[in-house]
Design a protein with these regions (language model features):
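Exported/periplasmic ABC-transporter solute-binding proteins
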Residues: 26-93, 97-107, 113-254
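General helical structural elements
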Residues: 6-8, 88
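N-terminal secretory signal peptides that target proteins for export/translocation
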Residues: 1-4
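Bacterial N-terminal signal peptides
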Residues: 9-21
């Protein structure tokens, strides 16, 4: 039996996730774009799909601005599973096939602390506001769809100016986790599924009054030459097997 291996290759824009397949004759090699917030489920989803289909998929993961740049200037790709904010950019939207994108997963914002630290109250807008104001520092990822929603939440709470001075901007979801786990930031404020990581304790999701979910949607690239294989992967993402993985990684399918 051939052993499978996983390789993460750093790039100037996010990460490239390469998962080799069994190499069936005639199998497609797909290039895909993905939001960094779905890195954990994507790894398992691709592995399961490859085992069943024989196709190979290489995912380039990044923030929303990075994905827009990848879509418009990063070379050919076959499909994307990206935050819906990517499709709001006209140049990026033009690189995807006509027709509606299909919602695959969604997740809301939350707050985490270093494991073992006191767990502040974030259960109401006022409690969240006071927790954020009392924190000495927070880690988030402003240059992302989730980070933009964090900043909008600060605006709704009326604390934008105060938070600007104590925000330690990170460059990737993994760095948000690391900053809190290493004690470089008191709070992590980002997607709940990303914050659910070793070294962190999630203290709670944002209250519904200020909560905004990030929706990851799938769409074919306009110029893909592997239409059938790309469609097959998107169809697989909607199966019970795939939605079970999505749920297990702290996200809501659809």
């Amino acid at each position: 039996m051939r052993k499978r291996s996983f390789t993460l290759v750093a790039s100037t824009l996010g990460l490239t996730l390469v998962l080799p397949s069994a190499g069936n004759v005639g199998a497609a090699e797909l290039q895909a774009l993905g939001g960094g917030g779905i890195a954990a489920p994507v790894k398992e989803l691709v592995a399961q799909f490859e085992n069943a289909s024989g196709h190979r998929i290489a995912f380039r993961l990044g923030t929303t601005p990075e994905l827009i740049k990848l879509a418009t200037t990063g070379g050919p790709f076959d499909l994307g599973v990206v935050p819906r904010e990517v499709f709001a950019d006209p140049a990026a939207q033009a690189r995807f096939a006509l027709g509606p994108a299909i919602n695959i997963a969604r997740v809301g914002l939350g707050v985490a602390v270093r494991s073992g630290s006191p767990r502040p109250d974030v259960s109401t807008p006022e409690a969240l506001k006071q927790t954020l104001l009392k924190a000495k520092s927070i880690a988030t990822l402003p240059e992302s769809a989730a980070g933009a929603q964090v900043l909008r939440a600060f605006e709704r709470l009326g604390i934008s100016n105060e938070m600007q001075a104590k925000t330690k901007a990170q460059k990737s979801p993994a760095q948000v986790v690391e900053a809190v786990a290493q004690g470089e930031a008191e709070l992590g404020v980002f997607l709940v599924n990303v914050l659910t990581a070793p070294g962190l304790d999630v203290v709670g999701s944002f209250p519904k009054e200020v909560q905004q979910e990030i929706i990851f949607a799938a769409a074919l690239a306009a110029n893909t030459k592997e239409v059938d294989a790309a469609k097959a992967f998107i169809a697989y993402l909607q199966t019970p097997a795939a939605t079970a993985i999505i749920k297990a990684k702290g996200m809501t399918p659809g």
